[in-house]
A protein has these predicted regions:
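Bacterial N-terminal signal peptides
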Residues: 11-21
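Long, amphipathic alpha-helical surface segments
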Residues: 26-62, 75-80, 86-106, 128-183
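Early exported N-terminus immediately downstream of N-terminal targeting peptides
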Residues: 67-71, 75
Length: 183
């Protein structure tokens, strides 16, 4: 294997990955005795439940010791809240749903986009979208207020951290759009 160049090794690995992907896809073909593909998956869930699952997937679990002031699936601990070191999944789920419900109420006036905006605000904070003394109102919100529906680019612009586009955040935004955007 020493005589193989990096380029050849890369091609071999890609070929093996494509072969494995093909085999996996063949194993997932529906049969007559199994439920149809449309009956399965996240799109069968109500939009709010899709939003909760998406947040849980991308936020991951926050331990109070390592991630203070965040806990559970990204709940920010407020000054009046006291939590024990071992937060249960049930309590964390309740906190996430409560936070998301509050954000939905905050964006209620935006109608069918309120859940999408709430999920974005859960990650970046509501004032990066709504604007305040530190941040101007986002272009995304301005477009929604004008009734424009081509908001994909503006939504995907929220994938920056320290002025760099972060691929993992971009994937998250694309997933959120696919799950929650209503054209």
């Amino acid at each position: 294997m020493r005589f193989m160049t990096g380029k050849i090794r890369t091609y071999i690995i890609l070929a093996l990955l494509l072969l494995c992907q093909n085999i996996m896809a063949q194993n997932k073909t529906p049969t007559t005795d199994s439920p149809s593909q449309s009956d399965l998956g996240i799109f069968a869930l109500p939009p709010f439940e899709r939003a909760v699952r998406c947040i849980k997937y991308y936020e991951g679990w926050h331990d109070i010791k390592r991630n203070y002031p965040y806990i559970g699936w990204g709940h920010r601990i407020l000054p009046h809240e006291k939590f024990k070191k071992n937060l249960t999944y049930l309590k964390a789920d309740s906190l996430l749903r409560s936070d998301l419900t509050k954000l939905c109420a905050m964006f209620r006036r935006y109608g069918k986009d309120s859940l999408l905006l709430a999920v974005l605000a859960y990650n970046v904070g509501p004032y990066k979208i709504l604007g305040n003394s530190k941040f101007p109102k986002s272009h995304l919100l301005e477009k929604i207020e004008r009734g424009l529906r081509n908001i994909e680019k503006d939504y995907l612009d929220f994938c920056r951290w320290r002025d760099k586009c972060i691929p993992s955040i971009r994937r998250r935004r694309m997933t959120e759009l696919q799950l929650l955007y209503i054209p």
